[in-house]
Amino acid sequence: NPQGEGIDGEFDQAPLYCFDGFDCVTFVNNVLALALSHNLSEFQKKLLLINYYDGIARFDNRFHFMSADWNVQNQKNKFVTDITADIFDEKNKSIALFAEGEIDKPNWFLKKAESETAERADYLRRIALIVKKEFVSLPYLPLLKLFDENKNPREYLFNQIPNTSIIEIVRPNWNLKDKIGTNLHVSHLGFAIRKSNGELFFRHASSEQKCVVEVLLSDYLKNILKSQTIKGINVQAIYQRIAGSAVAGLFFS
């Protein structure tokens, strides 16, 4: 487990952070926190703000859902801003569509409780009584708009994606309710990294390759065009004061 609430955590005693193993979310969280910080203490504080309500490390406070928690709170904290709807076609019209639907937080906690010990299950059921379902409207760039009829990338669209942006892979109302208790809208994420030659890469923690990898963003997306559930990408731009800092340059090159 690459992330928990630390040894004093009530539910999850895994480390608050580690650098020898990531999933896609913890990779983004750690890199973003490092880019915001100049020392270990600052990194630890920023990491808590990036991943927990009020920066308090408790399982019930964690941003479990990208669309309902992570995006909303990190926009409020002014770490990122959603620019998906600001990507325009050649007629200067936004190409964004919206993934809309409920995130059933109570049922997610109840479903998770089914596979836990009695004491841990009771903890999760108590949380389920407090949290509420949330309606989410998440903009995304449709894959079918990002490529032409011959599956060639429309470069003028990719060129509008800023360097260091966070790319979220969007599956509108991804049907996981029977498995985890709720549908989801986001299944994966990583960074868009623009090289000096202008090429835009997708840097992400790959569950298939078991490491952090880079691939041309257009190639990555082209390979999933046939997916029945993946429909597009959401773009969260990192605030320029962060992306343009000297510290951030170490991580986004």
Describe every region a protein language model picked out:
Residues 167-252:
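C-terminal soluble interaction/assembly domains
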